[in-house]
């Protein structure tokens, strides 16, 4: 309403529920910009589509997410393609505890796989994502098996054993080092993890006869100007080479940009700085960042 400012002051409103889940991102961003000046705690009700599909409960109130500030609507996924690789299948995610791997796991369990195998090097990251998925599965009464396995994708025979033991049909290979400055300073480890681990995991998938192997790559693999980008491009070339050896396993690559809110990106850093009361720091005043 036009007199929202006066309404908030008169009735001492300290919380606003944003109940317009079906509105466009652009309109949502406009509303949030107006509410920002009121200094009132704002929460959102879940999208009706998420409620109907079981992704959310109708009584779940959500904090405003950075994605709500985007000025466009998200591009919906191709459900036919997802079903072909996930529904009723045994799916493994390597690097399952990372920011990208864990989000893949969250989305995969909602698409009715037979089982999800979480393959992760970090014990605490594996524990966290397993606990979260089991809670999600129980609360939404999903019929999905979850197995949490510690392991290094570089160890080909460990990967091979896991693929065979769980009858894995689809692999999402998200295990990698992705931070440009760190990989720049740790070149050998970057090559070891991003190139050789991909090679060994893909070879294991080839030998077992996995149906689909998807490498989570990066836009930095395009005409790479950093060690990290070069290692991911090498990993892509490895898969392209392996594809010439078989028609049984389909090797795929997807290139991500900077994912909004992923670990190590500036958005979580900004949020933490704001929670601590500032200041909010930037690398350079003229830097322009792009997110997906």
Where are the language model's segments positioned?
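NAD(P)-cofactor binding segment of oxidoreductase domains
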Residues: 29-45, 115-122, 165-166, 170, ...
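NAD(P)-dependent short-chain dehydrogenase/reductase
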Residues: 134, 203-206, 227, 233-292
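Flexible, Lys/Arg-rich cytosolic regulatory linkers and terminal tails that connect or flank
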Residues: 2, 28-90, 96-97, 206
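Proline-aspartate-enriched helix->loop->beta-strand connector
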Residues: 8, 12-15, 113-114, 163-172, ...
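Conserved Rossmann-fold NAD(P)-dependent oxidoreductase catalytic core, especially the SDR/UDP-sugar
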Residues: 54, 173, 177-236, 241-242
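Conserved Rossmann-fold cofactor-binding substructure of NAD(P)-dependent oxidoreductases
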Residues: 147-170
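A solvent-exposed beta-alpha-beta segment
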Residues: 1-53, 121-130, 147, 151
């Amino acid at each position: 309403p036009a007199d929202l400012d006066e309404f908030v002051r008169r009735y001492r409103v300290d919380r606003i529920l944003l109940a317009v889940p079906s509105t466009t991102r652009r309109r949502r961003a406009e509303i949030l910009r107006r509410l920002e000046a009121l200094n009132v705690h704002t929460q959102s009700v879940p999208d009706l589509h998420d409620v109907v599909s079981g992704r959310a409960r109708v009584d779940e109130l959500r904090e405003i997410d950075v994605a709500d500030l985007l000025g466009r609507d998200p591009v919906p996924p191709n459900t036919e393609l997802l079903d072909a690789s996930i529904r009723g299948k045994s799916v493994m995610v390597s690097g399952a505890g990372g920011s990208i791997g864990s989000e893949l796991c969250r989305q995969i369990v909602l698409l009715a796989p037979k089982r999800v195998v979480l393959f992760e090097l970090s014990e605490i990251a594996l524990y966290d994502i397993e606990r979260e998925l089991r809670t999600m599965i129980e609360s939404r009464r999903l019929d999905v098996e979850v197995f949490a396995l510690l392991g290094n994708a570089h160890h080909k025979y460990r990967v091979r054993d896991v693929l065979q033991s769980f009858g894995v049909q689809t692999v999402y290979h998200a295990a990698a080092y992705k931070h440009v400055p760190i990989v720049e300073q740790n070149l050998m480890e970057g090559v070891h993890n991003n190139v050789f681990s991909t090679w060994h995991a893909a070879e294991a998938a080839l030998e077992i006869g996995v149906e689909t192997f998807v490498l989570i790559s990066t836009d930095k693999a395009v005409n790479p100007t950093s060690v990290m980008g070069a290692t991911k491009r090498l990993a892509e070339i490895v898969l392209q080479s392996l594809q010439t050896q078989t028609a049984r396993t389909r090797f795929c690559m997807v290139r991500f940009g900077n994912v909004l809110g992923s670990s190590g990106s500036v958005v979580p850093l900004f949020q933490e700085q704001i929670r601590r009361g500032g200041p909010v720091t930037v690398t350079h005043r003229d830097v322009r960042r792009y997110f997906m």
